[in-house]
Each structure stands twice: as structure tokens, then as C-alpha cells.
């Protein structure tokens, strides 16, 4: 089944891409959720418009991503204070959303939580962690997060 994506789909493509998928995946997942439309001549013209708009935005996006990268690198180590149960174990865990909040609180830019990659699913110990931040295709940086006990 040939479809045109309307939004970014992980491991498949971005908005405006024409993709060939199995019928069941297209009918049962992509089409009902509005992630894709059936490829017709009119839809292909619409996809070309989406693609051109995305390319224009991408040029601005790379410049903006480099500015955000400079801002993050200028922060240095980001301190994240959490409640602990003793012996360095946390109550709960530190998620990507918590890291994004700590970066914002330290005077950094507002990021999407999907841009931050944690070493495992979540951070569950006190310590210093170096995390990857993917801002744009080809633009990434690292941020050091110091997880410390509250009080």
C-alpha cells in the first residue's frame, strides 16, 4: 500500500514522504490515526508542498539548533535536586522531562523531552550523568546533569 505521511513516524519517515507499507499497518494504524493519507495524484501534489515547506523550515531549523546548542553548552553542569531514600537511591526516578525542566530552570532554552537521551530508561541513583541532546539532524550536544539529594 502506497501512503504519504502527514506527520513524522518513527522508523518510517517524515511529513510529505511517500512510503510503501504493508496493507494491515496502513489500514489499521497509519490511516485511522491520521498519520498518513492514501497516495493519489492530488495527495502527491500536497506532499510536494509539505516537503518544500519542510525544507525551507529545515534551513532555519539548523541555524536555530546551533543557537540552542551554544546556549546549552554555555550552561555547564546542570544541578537537579531530588528526594532520596538514603544510600543514594531516589524516590521514583529522573526522567527526560525532569532533565528538560532542570535545563530550563538553569536559564537554558525550553526543549522537547524527546530531544534528551537518558543512559537507560530513567536515572535512579545520585551522581553526575552526561546526557545526549539531539536538537536537529546533524546537530547534537552533551549536557552534564548532577543529580543531588534534597536538603
Curated annotation (Swiss-Prot):
**Record-level GO cellular component terms:** ribonucleoprotein complex; ribosome
Show the InterPro entries listed in the entry.
Answer: Ribosomal_bL9, Ribosomal_bL9/RNase_H1_N, Ribosomal_bL9_bac/chp, Ribosomal_bL9_C, Ribosomal_bL9_C_sf, Ribosomal_bL9_N, Ribosomal_bL9_N_sf
**Gene Ontology MF annotations:** rRNA binding; structural constituent of ribosome
Q: Name one GO biological process term.
A: translation
Family per record: Belongs to the bacterial ribosomal protein bL9 family.
Q: Could you tell me what this protein does?
A: Binds to the 23S rRNA.
Extract the HAMAP family matched here. Ribosomal_bL9
Q: What is this protein called?
A: Large ribosomal subunit protein bL9
The organism is Mycobacteroides abscessus (strain ATCC 19977 / DSM 44196 / CCUG 20993 / CIP 104536 / JCM 13569 / NCTC 13031 / TMC 1543 / L948)
Gene name of this polypeptide: rplI
